Amino acid sequence: MDIDPYKEFGASVELLSFLPSDFFPSVRDLLDTASALYREALESPEHCSPHHTAIRQAILCWVELMTLASWVGQNLQDQASRDLVVNYVNTNMGLKIRQLLWFHISCLTFEREVVLEYLVSFGVWIRTPPAYRPPNAPILSTLPETTVIRRRGRSPRRRTPSPRRRRSQSPRRRRSQSREPQC
């Protein structure tokens, strides 16, 4: 069975394969990032989004994989065989987990459409012969200048005060935003 874990998100294994393996941070760094940004939502018993669910599943798979690796390390006597297993896990399984975690964390951080646009842009860039492409690869955190990011459900703020109000001479204080689960 050929299952593509990105299909329901509008991406594909092939699309992510354009990114070189050293592009993806270590699993430890990705887990730290997921925990720092989305711990509350990931630990919540409530469903937040398919991306949160996918991150949970990837974390569970990684934990199981590490349990297996520990067992192999303790029970396989032949050092050469042990090294082969560890190398396979790090090269193949580790990369798949890193790709999954990176994709879903990025979708939560930058929004899915931006990540998909980035993957397509990078794919076009990497397949263009070096003589014909810009020297620098596209960067995910660089959004086009025309992009406007607004929270859902909120109307845009007025840019000018109403004519009846007088402007205060003192600077305005910003309201502190309360930290809520980012679902």
Swiss-Prot record:
Gene3D superfamilies: Viral capsid, core domain supefamily, Hepatitis B virus. Residues 143-183 are annotated as: Disordered. One of its GO terms (molecular function) is RNA binding. Residues 177-183 are annotated as: RNA binding. It is found in: Virion; Host cytoplasm. GO terms for biological process: microtubule-dependent intracellular transport of viral material towards nucleus; symbiont entry into host cell; viral penetration into host nucleus. Its main location: virion. Disulfide bonds: none annotated. Belongs to the orthohepadnavirus core antigen family. Self assembles to form an icosahedral capsid. Most capsids appear to be large particles with an icosahedral symmetry of T=4 and consist of 240 copies of capsid protein, though a fraction forms smaller T=3 particles consisting of 180 capsid proteins. Entering capsids are transported along microtubules to the nucleus. Phosphorylation of the capsid is thought to induce exposure of nuclear localization signal in the C-terminal portion of the capsid protein that allows binding to the nuclear pore complex via the importin (karyopherin-) alpha and beta. This is Capsid protein. It comes from Hepatitis B virus genotype B1 (isolate Japan/Ry30/2002). The gene is C.
